Amino acid sequence: MHPAKAVLIAPLTSVAIDDANLEAACEWIAVAGYFNAGQDCTAATRVIVEASAYDDVVALLSEQAKNVIKVGMPNEDVLVGPVNNANQLARVQGFLDRVPAHARVTAGGTAIKRPGYFWNPTVVADLKQDDEMIQSEIFAPVITVQKFSDEAQAVKYANGVKYGLASSVWTKDHGRAMRMAKAFDFGCVWINTHIPMVAEMPHGGFKHSGTGKDLSAYGFEEYTRIKHVMTNLNA
């Protein structure tokens, strides 16, 4: 029997350092978080921000959600289409109804009153590590934002969920980025980008985000058996 292989959903983590190009980072994170209404296994829906850049990032992401990201029926100009069905729309509403008192909804937070299952691009700031929206997969156009004080806390927060599919880190300090990438417990780490996939690199998560890999030579290995053959050439 061949072992099962699965790539499962997970809230993807983006860590923003204060020396990053914040405007470019937030523009990219918004696209990576909201495209396909956030219904992608690698969507950038969870953002952890260094304290000194926190207010700027919340403002920039909120601006993207309110005034830049287009919502409607899918076409080349629209990034956010409907969520999958009525049950999923109600599930998203439930998450927003249960936003804790210490958190702020800085953009969106409501369904769109039109035919279909549309949800406004949403930003929820000031969340804590144990909050439901951090520990659960929302699978909708909802980006959550947390604050960290130092690199160790950023890594602790990033890894402190049961999922581990993919993550990204945004900084001009490549040495720091590589150090954090090594510490992240995720099957993929992007640096100063998010979402691009290439056929020659493996894709698959750790922990509850699945088993095995697809893409690349590692993906082929999932469908092969290894056989050892030895011969005595002197016989």
Where are these regions (language model features)?
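ALDH superfamily catalytic-core signature
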Residues: M1-K128, I191
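Conserved C-terminal structural/oligomerization subdomain of aldehyde/semialdehyde dehydrogenase
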Residues: H2, A111, F118-A235
